[in-house]
Amino acid sequence: METELLKVFDSNRIQTGVASREEVHRLGHWHEVFHCWFASSEAGVDYLYLQHRCAMKKDYPNLWDITPAGHLLAHETVYDGVREIKEELGIDVSFDELVPLGIIEYHQTKEGFIDKELANVFLYESAHSFDDFTLQPEEVSGLVKVVLTDFEELWTEAKDKVYIKGFEMNHEGRRMMN
């Protein structure tokens, strides 16, 4: 597999160079990522989509995550982030369809892994059905939607469970609806 090269930044968001993804996370360099929250509104109810990260992922395996998210490579700009949508979900979206929400600084340290992200965050108002999605199995093992207000209550710990609707891919590549 080819080494992914990422732009690295200082604490003022000024690019200072380029480094491998491994070095970026080992040394804790600030780097750019693309996050796109899929949302929909159905019968007056707002939903937020989440993807289930593949259990084989090196970073944050088997967790629910933003739909989709990924590193911006050294030769890419934020406009190229839409490739993550196509790669992970099989949906063609143009950058003009995205609503910019800002750049969020995110920092997490685990043993041997320092993740310092400058997350370029966007919203996509989706009219797609679950049948429209083709998941990239190396990255994503499932896709669900949750009522937005329920998700907010889960996030703020007002609830400890929420109802989700969507699917997981089984080991044979078939969709298992929930």
PLM feature spans:
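Acidic, metal-coordinating catalytic segment for phosphate/diphosphate chemistry
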Residues: 1-44
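Residues that flank catalytic or metal-binding motifs in active/ligand-binding sites
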Residues: 4, 32-34, 68, 100, ...
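A sequence-level detector of short linear motifs
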Residues: 15-18, 50, 177
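Conserved Nudix-box catalytic region and its N-terminal flanking loop in Nudix hydrolases
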Residues: 23-35, 44-88
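A short coil-to-beta-strand element that immediately follows conserved catalytic motifs
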Residues: 92-102
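Nudix hydrolase/Nudix homology domain
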Residues: 102-178
